[in-house]
């Protein structure tokens, strides 16, 4: 673990190494993963970055290409159930371009989901992490892993 070597660590971006939603009973369909009562939002994601020792994280479990279309900070859903909507397949005009939900991948997510802003959200989060680290731990080592969404579809 990085922590045993006194590294302060972060992972921002897509996380394809687990990140399963904690069950609260039986499983539901992936499309309704956020609003159903079959998940326990008081517990962090199972096998999220925090599980393997990252000090900070802000992730999406499927990147920009699959539900849930929401960020999770340090293992916990960032939005509330009141701010969840079903994203249907389609194209959604956004200030920075066209956000897309691909055929076969409708699903729930944050009402403010915008795949075109994804990378800049992660870049800004990384800058904040680095600024904080240099201000508060400038003599300590750090590890920063950023998994941007630009290498994946959908693109527009």
Map each language-model feature to its residues:
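Formylglycine-dependent sulfatase
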Residues: 1-156
């Amino acid at each position: 673990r990085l922590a045993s070597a006194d590294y302060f660590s972060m992972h921002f971006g897509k996380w394809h190494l687990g990140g399963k939603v904690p069950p609260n009973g039986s499983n539901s369909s992936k499309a309704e993963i956020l609003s159903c009562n079959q998940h326990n939002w008081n517990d962090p994601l199972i096998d999220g970055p925090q599980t393997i020792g990252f000090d900070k994280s802000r992730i999406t479990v499927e990147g920009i290409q699959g539900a849930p279309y929401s960020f999770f900070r340090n293992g916990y859903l960032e939005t509330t159930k009141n701010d969840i909507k079903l994203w249907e397949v389609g194209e959604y005009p956004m200030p920075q371009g066209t956000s897309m939900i691909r055929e076969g991948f409708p699903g729930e997510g944050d009402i403010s989901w915008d795949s075109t802003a994804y990378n800049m959200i992660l870049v800004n989060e990384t800058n904040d992490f680095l600024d904080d680290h240099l201000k508060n731990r400038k003599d300590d080592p750090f590890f920063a892993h950023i998994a941007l969404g630009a290498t994946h579809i959908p693109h527009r």
